[in-house]
Curated annotation (Swiss-Prot):
Gene that encodes it: yitQ
Any one Pfam family match given in the protein's UniProt record, by short name: HAAS
Membrane topology annotation: Multi-pass membrane protein
Primary localization class, coarse: membrane
Organism: Bacillus subtilis (strain 168)
Name under which the protein is recorded: Uncharacterized protein YitQ
Location within or outside the cell: Cell membrane
Superkingdom in the source lineage: Bacteria
Species lineage: Bacteria, Bacillati, Bacillota, Bacilli, Bacillales
Entry's Gene Ontology cellular component terms: plasma membrane
Membrane-crossing residue ranges in chain numbering: 89-106, 111-128, 149-168, 172-194
């Protein structure tokens, strides 16, 4: 059984699919992923998987190279990549406007821009499955496609929950709002560390 051949083939296909990605970014992503795949393959070889089962296990855990490349490039293509950069800029502009608008609003409505921003951010996380904004994700290992989708869904729900808490804050005691935010934050980061 030649696990190295399976790893090399997978990495070659992924490298070809990531041709539009900048060289340094592509090399870093491939090097990091190769370490994860190598450890995964070695564990499966010790478990006694055949070469065919090993190939299937790699693709089920890490996705097909084309799917993984599309995910890494923000759903693929240079035009989509440019569009996603515009999307990130749009979110940054929204955050700046939110910060500027806060002192201009009456005190009863100062929570609204932040709640709207959290809702937009939740939609972005749900649709794009971008997890790097969550600090707990950055420090952890590479995750499979299924875990990324699950964490993005839970993260989007978490952000929406925070937005709803902010919208309800005029009707709730400040201590209750603070406790809801603290408990939900702790629960979300506990979820990330367990995953």
């Amino acid at each position: 059984m030649n696990g190295q051949l399976i790893i090399d083939r997978y990495m070659e296909e992924l490298n070809a699919e990531l041709a539009n990605m900048p060289d340094v970014e592509r090399e870093n992503a491939i090097d990091e992923l190769k370490g994860h795949i190598t450890a995964f393959v070695q564990d499966r070889i010790k478990a006694g998987l055949s070469e065919e089962e090993l190939q299937e296990a790699v693709e089920s855990e890490f996705s097909h190279p084309k799917e993984l490349a599309e995910l890494m490039m923000g759903d693929g293509g240079e035009t989509k990549r440019r569009r996603s950069l515009l999307g990130k800029s749009w979110i940054s502009v929204l955050l700046i406007v939110t910060i500027i608008a806060l002192p201009l609003l009456p005190s009863d409505f100062r929570h609204l821009p932040l709640a709207v921003y959290l809702m937009v951010l939740a939609g972005y996380v749900w649709k794009r499955k971008k997890l790097v904004m969550f600090a707990g994700v950055r420090k952890n290992k590479m995750r499979s496609q299924k875990e990324i989708v699950k964490i993005s869904r839970v993260g989007a729900v978490y952000l929406l929950f925070l937005a709803v808490v902010l919208l309800l804050s005029p009707f709730l005691n400040a201590l209750v709002v603070l406790l809801l935010i603290a408990v939900s934050c702790a629960a979300f980061f506990l979820f990330l560390n367990i995953k």
